[in-house]
Curated annotation (Swiss-Prot):
This is 6,7-dimethyl-8-ribityllumazine synthase. (2S)-2-hydroxy-3-oxobutyl phosphate binds at G84, T85, R126. It comes from Corynebacterium efficiens (strain DSM 44549 / YS-314 / AJ 12310 / JCM 11189 / NBRC 100395). Catalyzes the formation of 6,7-dimethyl-8-ribityllumazine by condensation of 5-amino-6-(D-ribitylamino)uracil with 3,4-dihydroxy-2-butanone 4-phosphate. This is the penultimate step in the biosynthesis of riboflavin. The gene is ribH. The active site is at H87. Pfam families: DMRL_synthase. GO terms for molecular function: 6,7-dimethyl-8-ribityllumazine synthase activity. HAMAP family: Lumazine_synth. Belongs to the DMRL synthase family. GO terms for cellular component: cytosol; riboflavin synthase complex. Keywords: Riboflavin biosynthesis, Transferase.
């Protein structure tokens, strides 16, 4: 697993920010870990965190879109593991495109913590499991909060 170029992850001071975490229930063990780590990071940064669950990754964009209207940032979490059909590609492309479009259309940061892996082992390695090198739930939260703070500063500078 490549970690080259990954910036050091530090919690920003997100006191006063409202962030929502939306987590898919498919691949529950992995998604629950992503969820717990994202929520823990958000609260440790001082953000007000609200939590929501959806069935699968395809349901994430519509809920994220609604929450983007009322929150400073939203974190989307899920896990899509490649199977034997092209369905994997359709789901991954659709979710990624949807989350990106929502962020751009609403100017609300969306932390994309949807794992798209070839194997369950790869997903576990990225989910913050004990001994894993990556923690995509916490990383998605930090990215969303950090971006919300940058946007807040830009908006304040505009007056």
């Amino acid at each position: 697993m490549a970690k080259e170029g990954l910036p050091e992850i530090t919690l920003p001071d997100a006191t006063g920010l409202r962030v929502a975490v939306v987590t898919a229930r498919w691949n529950a063990e992995i998604c629950d870990r992503l969820h717990d780590h994202a929520v823990t990071a958000g609260r440790a940064a001082g953000a007000e965190v609200s939590e929501y669950r959806v069935v699968g990754a395809l349901e994430l964009p519509v809920v994220v879109q609604e929450l983007a209207r009322t929150h400073d940032a939203v974190v989307a979490l899920g896990c899509v593991i490649r199977g034997g059909t092209p369905h994997f590609d359709y789901v991954c492309d659709s979710v990624t495109e949807g989350l990106t479009r929502i962020a751009l259309d609403t100017s609300t940061p969306i932390g994309n913590g949807v794992l798209t892996t070839n194997t369950e082992e790869q997903a576990i390695e990225r989910s913050g499991a004990e001994g894993s090198v990556e923690d995509k739930g916490a990383e998605a939260m930090v990215a969303a909060l950090d971006t919300a703070l940058v946007l807040s500063r830009i908006r304040a500078d505009r007056g």
